[in-house]
């Protein structure tokens, strides 16, 4: 846990310091939306940079957790498509909120992104020329495509830290405690961007708190799929897809505010809580993994441990892995096992 705390402090201080340099040194902020958006993309890679530096200091391999794994499983597909389902549910729930109606319109887009007056009419004409169903389909298609390509690459910069390095540093911690810790760090890490109007342009101060709530809830989902798939790549895909499709909510709702609207508001929080509850039911009563009740290390090691038979023969330890016997001792193959795994077993 000390390693996780060390990383969390360093990544936040480093990221916030870089933001301070860009903000006060180059004037990047709420008044420069293009510059802020560009820096936000760069900002996403600071968790990766911090993790790599600490790994170099600690003499750890790049993929010491084994989670930079591109083996596709069914859970990848679920994590990729789930954001689309959640966004549609979010729109429906948003329509039940006070002062909000379900209506295909451009006004929410104009207000949310503070479109200049001389461009507002053009935005209205462009949206009115597209039927609602076509807008929805195009957003879904482009969002899913971006979610597994450019957005996933950008999200990898964050997820290598949150759902890879921190997971490796918290092997002994149980799922819920780890998810809460990682989500909280992920949320407060965003605070300079939030104060500049990112995600909550009309309520930046309250937005800092709302972002922490969002990150904790979204972090539970992402961590579950990482442990289920034994790969942090699935978190990058899910993160990238959420970023790509969540904007669809502003096309089909009218009214409301930053507290209520979208995946980062109350509507999205309700959807994610319901989704987490469904996963809890599945994990407890249907799945054989029971990830939510285990430590991160046990969840990650289950795929190995289930195939390992250990027997003792005097001073030797025999490990039968996949039908092949490995005998410990000087120069034996077992000595080449991942040191982190051997240490954990000891």
Segments (PLM) and residue ranges:
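Transmembrane alpha-helical insertion/packing segments
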Residues: 1-51, 78, 154, 158, ...
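Residue-level signature of the transmembrane alpha-helical core
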Residues: 12, 45, 80, 144, ...
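Alpha-helical transmembrane segments of multipass membrane proteins
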Residues: 14-19, 46-50, 82, 86-90, ...
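Alpha-helical transmembrane segments in multi-pass membrane proteins
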Residues: 18-57, 67, 73-91, 104-129, ...
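Transmembrane alpha-helical segments in integral membrane proteins
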Residues: 54, 138-165, 230-233, 237-243
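Hydrophobic alpha-helical membrane-insertion segments
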Residues: 78-101, 223-228, 232-235
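Membrane-interface helix/loop boundary segments of multi-pass membrane proteins
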Residues: 156-185, 227-231
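C-terminal membrane module of polytopic membrane proteins
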Residues: 204-206, 240-313, 318-322, 331, ...
